[in-house]
Amino acid sequence: MAMTAEVKDELSRLVVTQVSSRRAEVASLLRFAGGLHIVSGRVVVEAEVDQGSIARRLRKDIFDLYGYNAVVHVLSAGGIRKTTRYVVRVAKDGEALARQTGLLDLRGRPVRGLPAQVVGGSVADAEAAWRGAFLAHGSLTEPGRSSALEVSCPGPEAALALVGAARRLGVSAKAREVRGSDRVVVRDGEAIGALLTRMGAQDTRLTWEERRMRREVRATANRLANFDDANLRRSARAAVAAAARVERALEILGDTVPDHLAAAGKLRVEHRQASLEELGRLADPVMTKDAVAGRIRRLLSMADRKAKTEGIPDTESAVTPELLEEA
């Protein structure tokens, strides 16, 4: 099941006992999935959704909360309609329902955003508003570079109201107009997870987070694999160059090299692939990596000074293109 369908399936089965939250969900669902129509001079309320469980939930809530009977019409897939759709319609008491849910104001004019009682309601009402909006026109993409939780909105006012509701929940959401359609988008992974939990889709959040973590691990592994060969080549060349310079330094200094510098140099030559930290552990007594690096620097510096004085090739002369090619 796609992530969007999983979220909607879980939300449609969520048990909500608080009346104000149930009212906020119904109002939001009707606002984002529906519309008001005038049929034979009467106001008809309609909401079109993509799952039968959502339609049944809405019909039940309308009856439980307002006492009105809603009819569910099934629009089977076919022609330009790719999937089966469900239309919840209240005809006989449409105007009364529209007024009670806040779709119409006191003067009988359509409300363009979310109803005032939802906007000014509790945090639980804000959660319910998001739940209703997502059940109506929400989508959740698989975790990835362009993962997003989106809700298509009936207009900019409704989009801004939904952004405000998200802000009350501590979630950053943005209103966007995409190809003439108003949308509210949440892109941050942590914010998406938090919003799923707030809406009541905790199980789906866990699934989404698991897939997100797996994808991040794979992406990290791919990045490491892409750079691994280059890093290994660079490391190998650096090790070969360092060992060659140290060998040349020991040749230049001969018996005049101080014992402690000679010991550090021999460690570098004998353990070409070891890190400075590993060389420090191999030393007797044990040294820090900074101490090892310092002794090797002094060894090379001493040898280069002597080479310059005597007019002979210095330690850099040991690092030839042929040597690096072989690394």
Curated annotation (Swiss-Prot):
GO molecular function per UniProt: DNA binding
TM region positions: none
Chain segments carrying region Disordered: 307-327
Keywords: Cell cycle, Cell division, DNA-binding
GO BP annotation list: cell division; regulation of sporulation
DNA-binding region(s), chain positions: 275-308
Pfam families named in the record: HTH_WhiA (PF02650), LAGLIDADG_WhiA (PF14527), WhiA_N (PF10298)
Gene3D superfamilies: Homing endonucleases
InterPro entries found in the cross-reference section: Homing_endonucl (IPR027434), Sporu_reg_WhiA_N_dom (IPR018478), Sporulation_regulator_WhiA (IPR003802), Sporulation_regulator_WhiA_C (IPR023054), WhiA_LAGLIDADG_dom (IPR039518)
HAMAP family: HTH_type_WhiA
Free-text function comment from the UniProt entry: Involved in cell division and chromosome segregation.
Family recorded in the similarity comment: Belongs to the WhiA family.
Protein name as it appears in the record: Probable cell division protein WhiA
Organism encoding this protein: Mycobacteroides abscessus (strain ATCC 19977 / DSM 44196 / CCUG 20993 / CIP 104536 / JCM 13569 / NCTC 13031 / TMC 1543 / L948)
